[in-house]
């Protein structure tokens, strides 16, 4: 028995030594390999650095630091830092190395490229060290810190870790993609919790630094005693503070984390219960965390815990896996109804810009939604000031609670009521009491005569209707010909279109012809398929488009809808389309880097105008390089807008693909170019994707910004795509853009695991 115990003890020691390497100093050339399961451990053993499996990602590995104390069970050893904010590798031969030139590098052997590095090869790094406080540092001359993990936090702060102004924590997400939630410290001295980039749903209070005196030497810090301070280093004192409920208690381990549900919490290790206990949280009511339930509604159950549910299931198809408000089909011929939900507060999340109308009644609020084709739901509140919040998206989140006075109304289509076969009244049985003799020849003669008269009458009606329709159609054509509708758009006949284009003799593109108006004004005439939209909708759309004016939209001069053919007459663009230039090596030389980036911005502004600045939402529906024209000064003008019916996110996706085609000089509608560009970008070879015709004349920083926003636009999950307003700000340089998660199936790390798709391979 003693021999067996001794053997087990030896095996345990061998196992421990095989998986942990306690080092006081990490030498250049040191390496951790996925398949070897080795660790770098701090001197006190409280922290370890190594590869781990992110939750829910089978055969995927990230490199990070976690609590490693023997007093903490393995399932409670929380990760406190991850290289690259969630970068994953998949092959067992992938590794993390402190290279000879002083860089920390995470290398994916399957892709054959480094997917993250510390970018410290110019700092004369001599060694690395995982300190007892959990900070991984790179040292110059074994003393001076030139890089530290505390300086690149992910979602967690450890005691005494500084959180300076303009720094950010980003919550982890279940699929390892970049999360929607982030924590920011403004230079005004205020901590802010944000959803995406523009929704602040919690802050630490009023600004503590006056606007004229904003400065960078203000920071947040979690103390080992369990307090969170905002410190002004000039004043040498806290300007804001909160305390955990166990403040000043003897607790060995603490951390502050931005959790996946969007709330900021302070945790302490409880030795008695052997669990991490939350001792403070920023948002007391979890349902007040913006979009904490995604596109569902948050509420509290009888046990006091939050739960997410979908109140719209009764109005959507059972085949729709998402909880979305009903799709407002334009062809709903039976009208719309507003379904009432008491004690429910709704708000749009994609995009998160509800239209707010004050001093209004609930009836008027509902009516406005019914009159607006883009409106999907409204929330009405009257807490002293009546307010109507109109949602213009199907992606809606909310909060339900009996204490809420809010009333929400969801727009639904009134489908025709089908006849219930169970309610159809059955005929009463007829009892024949007496039989009579029947004259068969008389019956046949009468029936034949009646049938002939009936058919003759029907034939007469058909002939009359046909002749009347033909006459009305002729009058209608004459009425529209050589006319202008009330909104100023010319309406032409087919004969006029033929005369204008010299019988379609001058073809300048696919179904596009050069024409001359009677006033010698040059125009471009585009023939569109008559099957795309019915005549009434085509005329309505053309009339509406004629009222739109933006410098980056080609003016619609007129249209033709006659004899089964449809034409659009646009102002003439001298230099043709972007597609004409991309496919022609000689013409592509006109597209300098500045022209290309200006074109991206111009198209973004045009789409932003259509989506957000018109009285009603207008989609493009078919954006591509072929319908972006270049005027005399090579200024972009968008055509064929307003006739396609689609959601905003489809236009955003098409925009991203178009931008990538413009930057690379390669046009592939199937999206092959987009996937290739992403692989090059993630491999650190972004310069190779630029059109060779530019001969290296481009701005690297601008290229990075354009590629990042393009990858966000083409995300497979449409909820991750930005609004066109955000795209404009990014391209203008007034809004920063985070590194995007892999947008395509091609960005998977392993071809053998197709179910585990789209993992994050980006730099922080």
Curated annotation (Swiss-Prot):
Cytoplasmic side of membrane: 464-764
Residues covered by the Bulb-type lectin domain: 25-151, 154-279
SUPFAM superfamilies membership: alpha-D-mannose-specific plant lectins, Protein kinase-like (PK-like)
Annotated segments matching region Disordered: 738-764
Signal peptide: 1-24
Glycosylation sites: 92, 198, 248, 301, 353, 423
The protein's Enzyme Commission number: 2.7.11.1
Keyword hit for Transport: no
Superkingdom of origin: Eukaryota
Protein name: G-type lectin S-receptor-like serine/threonine-protein kinase SD3-1
Lineage: Eukaryota, Viridiplantae, Streptophyta, Embryophyta, Tracheophyta
């Amino acid at each position: 028995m003693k021999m067996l115990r001794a053997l087990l003890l030896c095996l345990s020691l061998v196992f421990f030594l095989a998986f942990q390497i306690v080092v006081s100093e990490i030498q250049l050339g040191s390496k951790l390999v996925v398949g070897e399961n080795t660790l770098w451990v701090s001197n006190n053993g409280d922290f370890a650095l190594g590869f781990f499996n992110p939750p829910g990602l089978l055969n995927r590995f990230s490199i990070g630091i976690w609590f490693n104390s023997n007093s903490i069970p393995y399932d409670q050893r929380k990760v406190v830092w991850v290289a690259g904010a969630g970068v994953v590798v998949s092959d067992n031969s992938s590794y993390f190395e402190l290279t000879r030139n002083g860089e920390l590098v995470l290398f994916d052997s399957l892709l054959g490229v480094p997917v993250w590095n510390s970018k410290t090869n110019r700092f004369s790094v001599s060694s690395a060290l995982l300190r007892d406080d959990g900070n991984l540092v790179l040292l110059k001359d074994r003393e001076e810190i030139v890089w530290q993990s505390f300086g690149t936090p992910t979602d967690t702060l450890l005691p005494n870790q500084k959180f300076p102004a303009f720094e950010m924590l980003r919550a982890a997400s279940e699929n390892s993609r970049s999360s929607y939630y982030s924590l920011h410290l403004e230079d005004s001295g205020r901590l802010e919790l944000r959803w995406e980039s523009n929704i602040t749903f919690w802050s630490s209070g009023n600004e503590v630094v006056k606007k004229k005196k904003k400065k960078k030497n203000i920071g947040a810090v979690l103390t080992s005693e369990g307090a969170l301070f905002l410190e002004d280093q000039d004043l040498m004192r806290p300007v804001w503070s909160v305390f955990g409920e166990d403040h000043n208690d003897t607790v060995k381990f603490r951390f502050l984390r931005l959790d996946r549900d969007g709330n900021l919490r302070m945790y302490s290790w409880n030795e008695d219960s052997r669990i991490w206990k939350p001792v403070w949280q920023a948002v007391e009511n979890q349902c007040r965390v913006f979009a904490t339930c995604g596109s569902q509604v948050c509420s509290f159950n009888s046990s006091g815990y939050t739960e997410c549910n979908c109140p719209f299931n009764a109005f959507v198809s059972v085949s729709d896996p998402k909880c979305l408000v009903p799709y407002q089909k334009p062809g709903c011929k039976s009208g719309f109804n507003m379904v009432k939900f008491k004690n429910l507060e709704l708000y749009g999340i994609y995009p998160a810009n509800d239209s707010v109308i004050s001093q209004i009644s609930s009836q008027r609020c509902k009516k406005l939604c019914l009159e607006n084709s883009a409106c999907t739901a409204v929330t009405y509140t009257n807490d002293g000031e009546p307010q109507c919040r109109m949602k213009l998206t199907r992606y809606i989140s909310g909060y339900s609670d009996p204490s809420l006075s809010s009333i929400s109304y969801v727009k639904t289509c009134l489908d025709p009521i089908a006849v219930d076969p169970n309610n159809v009244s059955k005929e009463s049985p007829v009892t024949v009491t007496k039989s009579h003799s029947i004259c068969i020849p008389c019956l046949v003669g009468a029936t034949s005569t009646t049938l002939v008269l009936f058919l003759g009458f029907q034939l007469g009606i058909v002939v009359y209707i046909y002749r009347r329709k033909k006459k009305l159609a002729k009058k209608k054509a004459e009425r529209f010909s050589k006319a202008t509708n009330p909104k100023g758009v010319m309406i032409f006949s087919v004969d006029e279109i033929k005369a204008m284009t010299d019988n379609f003799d001058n073809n300048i593109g696919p179904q596009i012809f050069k024409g001359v108006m009677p006033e010698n004004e040059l125009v471009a005439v585009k023939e569109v398929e008559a099957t795309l939209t019915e005549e009434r909708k085509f005329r309505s759309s053309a009339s509406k488009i004629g009222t739109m004016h933006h410098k980056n939209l080609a003016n619609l001069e007129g249209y033709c809808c006659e004899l089964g053919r449809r034409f659009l007459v646009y102002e003439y663009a001298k230099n043709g389309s972007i597609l004409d230039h991309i496919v022609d090596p000689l013409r592509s030389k006109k597209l300098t880097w500045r022209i290309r980036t200006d074109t991206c911005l111009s198209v973004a502004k045009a789409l932003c105008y259509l989506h957000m600045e018109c009285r009603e939402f207008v989609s493009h529906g078919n954006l591509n390089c072929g319908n972006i024209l270049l005027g005399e000064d090579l200024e972009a003008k968008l055509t064929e807008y307003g006739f396609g019916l689609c959601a905003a996110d489809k236009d955003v996706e098409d925009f991203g693909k178009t931008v990538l085609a413009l930057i690379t000089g390669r046009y592939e509608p199937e999206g092959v170019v987009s996937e290739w560009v992403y692989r090059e970008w993630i491999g650190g070879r972004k310069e190779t994707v630029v059109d060779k015709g530019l001969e290296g004349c481009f701005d690297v920083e601008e290229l990075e910004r354009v590629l990042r926003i393009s990858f966000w636009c083409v995300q497979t999950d449409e909820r991750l795509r930005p609004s066109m307003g955000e795209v404009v700000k990014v391209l203008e340089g007034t809004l920063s853009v985070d590194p995007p998660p892999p947008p395509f199936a091609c960005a998977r790390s392993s071809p053998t695991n197709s179910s585990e798709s789209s993992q994050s391979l980006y730099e922080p």
